[in-house]
Swiss-Prot record:
Chain ranges passing through the membrane: none
Residue stretches of biased makeup (Basic and acidic residues): 73-91
PANTHER family with a match to the protein in the record: GLUTAMATE-RICH PROTEIN 6B, SIMILAR TO CHROMOSOME 3 OPEN READING FRAME 20
Signal peptide residue numbers: none
UniProt-recorded name of the protein: Glutamate-rich protein 6B
Organism of origin: Homo sapiens (Human)
Chain intervals with Acidic residues compositional bias: 32-44, 54-72
Residue stretches of biased makeup (Polar residues): 1-10
Family according to the record: Belongs to the ERICH6 family.
InterPro entries: FAM194_C (IPR029281)
Region (Disordered): 1-105
Gene: ERICH6B
Domain of life of the native organism: Eukaryota
Amino acid sequence: MSAENNQLSGASPPHPPTTPQYSTQNLPSEKEDTEVELDEESLQDESPFSPEGESLEDKEYLEEEEDLEEEEYLGKEEYLKEEEYLGKEEHLEEEEYLEKAGYLEEEEYIEEEEYLGKEGYLEEEEYLGKEEHLEEEEYLGKEGYLEKEDYIEEVDYLGKKAYLEEEEYLGKKSYLEEEKALEKEENLEEEEALEKEENLDGKENLYKKYLKEPKASYSSQTMLLRDARSPDAGPSQVTTFLTVPLTFATPSPVSESATESSELLLTLYRRSQASQTDWCYDRTAVKSLKSKSETEQETTTKLAPEEHVNTKVQQKKEENVLEFASKENFWDGITDESIDKLEVEDLDENFLNSSYQTVFKTIIKEMAAHNELEEDFDIPLTKLLESENRWKLVIMLKKNYEKFKETILRIKRRREAQKLTEMTSFTFHLMSKPTPEKPETEEIQKPQRVVHHRKKLERDKEWIQKKTVVHQGDGKLILYPNKNVYQILFPDGTGQIHYPSGNLAMLILYAKMKKFTYIILEDSLEGRIRALINNSGNATFYDENSDIWLNLSSNLGYYFPKDKRQKAWNWWNLNIHVHAPPVQPISLKINEYIQVQIRSQDKIIFCFTYEQKQICLNLGTRYKFVIPEVLSEMKKKTILEAEPGPTAQKIRVLLGKMNRLLNYATTPDLENFIEAVSISLMDNKYLKKMLSKLWF
């Protein structure tokens, strides 16, 4: 507030108000303000007339300005007397005006006026109460400025009463009516507040108090400055701004500059009043009233000059209604102008968005309903049947299937035929099919590999099963008299036999396909192996020095006794006269408890005896009927021929493959092979040299 008061005291404002046509404005002096306000009112009212009337009126205004300059120094007493007289006339004329216009009959506007008058009056009192202290201090220090403030107060709160004096001099009653209508516009809020209190005398006293106190000038000027800074510009603002004449482009005299600045301030003040609107409140009513006023304004231009007064009065009445309906609260509008503008924009955007969304939703709903209707037609009849009806149909079909079998099959064939007809197939027949040319390739005859399946001897599994019954037990321990384990045999044929000392004598193992392995051990803690025997015809016995004592296979047998003649025989060739099995048996005594006798392939008897206890097992094997071809081969096998081991057998196979490759390879292939081998050998030598250099 202090900054605004300092600006009003005569200093230029730091941020001058901006308007669409003027970039900068200077505050006028006291006398200039009065002249500007009076001239602006006359110019605004006479703006709808023709350009010739405007030029005459401009001359009259210049004369009026000279008269007003003479009357400025008459004093406060004359204005106070005129105020009382004019105040009474104002109230009488306003009542007549209100009765004619019919505003008193409209209850809605009266309620709005009462509400707005209450708020505006209370806020003005609060605002004036806050500024009393600051304004009184400035009032004491500035006596010369008080006269200016008094004059400005008279002009602001008397409702442009100077226009009434000018009209009395000119004798224009129609102009008085227009001025009274304008007074009603500016003082409507204060009058409604006084009407609520039902004290017209109190209203006059308040006006006099306002006139006497200089604080009102500050408030009025601050109001004008705030309105000048407001950025809002509605349709009513544009029309009021255009009424300002542009003939004051050369501000040589002081009165012309004052008039221009005062006119701008008053136009901004009215623009701010028009902008203090809530567009959400009776927006349609305001638009209708405005359109009505515009149409009536167009009709007034066509009427005679005598009818201009009545049309202008009617236009002023409608503009009065517009401004009254748009003003909710003057002080709230000053402080919240930008906020109201943002709210209006948000409202418009929300309104458009909501209408667009509703239309979009309705379209989608219609499309969905249309799709649902289309889907209803595609529902098969089976889905429409209820569960009970379907169940009944199934029962009837089961009972009467034979009767309707032919019809059901006919329907199925028809449906299948329909499905086949729906599937279209295009077939193309060429006149002549091109025969694919096969590349000529030299046929290389590969050698036919003859695979000789090795015929093996097959064991007699039935005989082996009967033989193993002997050493199948129930898994019970049989002990010696000294409580050591004697033997334990299990139902699957496995078991153990122990010496009286407790050492293991024989271990019987079982593998798949009824393959048993018998291991005979020495009676010692070391437990050296004395014999390995299996039921496939292979066996090896070792003497005390761990040398081979006897070796048996499926074809041959070797016996290497000490200090005796060695024997070798073929089990399948009995023409060789050798004193060996199966002609002559061989007995081997391993220790005092174990003795083995070899009679034939199927009779290798193992005996374990201790005092009166004895266990005898047959460790031999028997083969099925041998084919003569196999038998002849087995007979031809020499006795001293060594059977190759697994590694030797692999080497023999590889050598045979190499032999076959060399037989069918050509000389160029061999030459290429030799070159590749020589290169690889050279590379190996070079690598070895490099490695040797690296190490050393």
